[in-house]
């Protein structure tokens, strides 16, 4: 596991005090979620980036992550979601790639004034997605 953590650390480039995002990777996000102790569901699932790694509608939210030094593949930016409908109450992963989703994530994350608050908001979003209540 120490090697896995070291691999994650080397994926994040730092130049002085400027934080540079690594490239989004669902495989790396999955590994980071598992390393953080997040239980992998027993149904078909995807490691979902709460703040999308490349979608144009998520640019501002990505800037917020960068501002607070949170990598796009950090476990705090992830949640396991079903890839099949109606297996659990969680949000269906493919349905989340929408303008409405990106705007709501951005609105919520914009309230963060520091790294801890940003992580807390990401955890809140993850919980809502896992419970299927994000759009309620």
Regions found by a protein language model. Name each.
Residues 7-136:
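Catalytic toxin/effector domains delivered as secreted proteins or via bacterial secretion systems
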Residues 1-5:
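Membrane-active amphipathic alpha-helices enriched in small hydrophobic residues
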């Amino acid at each position: 596991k120490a090697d896995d953590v070291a691999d994650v650390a080397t994926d994040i480039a730092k130049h002085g005090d400027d934080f540079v995002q690594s490239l989004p990777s669902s495989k790396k996000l999955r590994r980071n979620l598992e390393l953080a102790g997040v239980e992998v569901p027993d149904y078909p699932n995807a490691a979902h980036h709460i703040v999308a790694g490349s979608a144009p509608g998520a640019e501002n939210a990505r800037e917020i992550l960068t501002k607070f030094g949170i990598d796009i593949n950090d476990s705090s930016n992830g949640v396991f979601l079903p890839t099949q409908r109606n297996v659990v109450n969680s949000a269906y992963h493919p349905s989340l790639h929408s303008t409405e989703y990106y705007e709501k994530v951005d609105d919520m994350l914009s309230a963060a004034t520091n790294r801890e608050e940003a992580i807390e908001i990401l955890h809140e979003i993850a919980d809502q997605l896992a419970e299927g209540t994000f759009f309620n």
